[in-house]
Amino acid sequence: RLLGVRLETVAIEAPFKGFLEALSPLFNGLEPGIAEENLQSRCRGALMMALSNKFGGLLLTTGNKSEYAVGYATIYGDMCGGFGPIKDLYKTEVQALCRWRNARSPAIPE
């Protein structure tokens, strides 16, 4: 509200379960791991892209330079989008930017 943006919640459980069901014959007997974790992120990315397409928006990626440097990002998941506004900032710089913004009036949660 303070940022002037609309906030909605879209559940990923149904598409995630659908993907798991489709993959279950191939994943049968294997321990859950990174594939399932990445699949959750990819479900979010697909849903966000659908909203972006439907309403004519540009989906922004959320990754920063620190995350990309250590591989802490999921292709077609949190890297899904048309522009990365914080892609060239290290995590410490993102945190400093949030503190600077909140000093004016709190809008970004710690």
Predicted regions and their residues:
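Mid-to-C-terminal catalytic subdomains of enzymes
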Residues: 57-59, 64-110
